[in-house]
Amino acid sequence: MKRILIYITFSVITVVAAGQKPEYYLMKGKALIESGKPGDAAALMTEALKEKQDATFYLLRAEAFLAKGDYSSAIDDFNSANKLIPSSGEYGLARIYAIRNDAPTAVYHLELSMRSAFRKSEKEILTDPSFSLLENRPEWRQFWKKEWYTTPEKSMAEIEYNISTGNLAEAGNIFRTLSSAYPEDVNTAYSSALVSVSESKYSDAVKMLAQTLAEFPDNEKCLRLLASAQEASGNPAGASLSYTRLIELNVPDPELLIRRAGCYSKTGETEKAVDDIETYLGFYPESKKALSLAGKAASASGDNIRALSYFSENVRLHPNDPECFIDRANSYFMSRSWEWAARDYGMSLDLQPGNSEAWLNKGISLVNLGKTEDACFNFRKAFNLGNRNSTEYLSRYCIK
């Protein structure tokens, strides 16, 4: 497993030279920054820039320099991004000058960003810790006195907030007002789909979003919501296509790979699922979630040896997590390796004794090892924890 992960990491780092898709090394760069390795992220983007002068590479390298505290280099890269795509680096420049407590310059660049296609939402700006030093500055107060957002944008933000807090009735009221006043606005269409999803009307949401994306094919928010609605409606094939569209838009979000892998697993495209997960593991080699998903995908395809390699790596990395032992125990259980299954269920129960399913499966494993008395102890534990499936085994093996 270690050899696999080393190869994956190496192949992602050298992806530029191999001429593969840029979204994967953008994801890698983001992962390196998140993992506290901004220097490695900057080096990766430097290699990318040798192959192609792309604004997204400059922007990500600027973020890496910012994370290192190298503000001068970050400013240079944000300005380089601006030269390739006007205004693309203005928000980053605003953040740097805010961190430096230079309110006039920070607000100047923020206003340039707000007048461009790269404008951030009010929530994004207000929750960005970079601007915390400006909160009591007059320039900051003056900035927020201006009308930066349209009525549909404000209404959409209110709808998002009310849905997030469970106030669906108020979200519906705001949407009805919005739709009557601005029926053709893209924010109205998105809000309509958002309300439909909150009401579990997934087909309505999918229909609305498909119509909107026909006109605005690169709208990231709509694509993300479409993928979620497709998954919720039981259409993993459609969702995988939506996640692919997001990835091909160079959205530097590694979680898209995990979401797409989950869809591939549901459609039986196991190799595609494992490919996505292994790419993700190249970014986050110790991810419990990814190792678990990779093992389950391999197990579903009938490759138990491959599954066990992932599950064992997860146990090694996360020895105090009961779910890692359960994953491996389930794999042993499916392959009828009863002794190993019983051992791993036992390890999980040492960490989480309230898992009735683990008690039941450990009991079944022990029965198959001929240890009926020990098995009955486990069946009773499962029953006492509310597992009704244990009654069949209790009556068959334990009641004389």
Question: Where are the model-predicted features located?
Answer:
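Terminal, low-structured helical/coil segments at or just beyond the last alpha-helical repeat
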Residues: I125-Y161, N368-K400
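Structural marker of alpha-solenoid helical repeat scaffolds
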Residues: K50-E51, N82-L84, S116, A181, ...
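Helix-start (N-cap) detector for alpha-helical repeat units in TPR-like alpha-solenoids
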Residues: P22-E23, A55-T56, S87-E90, S121, ...
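Canonical positions in the second alpha-helix
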Residues: E47-A48, S80-A81, S113, T177-L178, ...
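Canonical tetratricopeptide repeat
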Residues: L60, G92, L126-D128, S191, ...
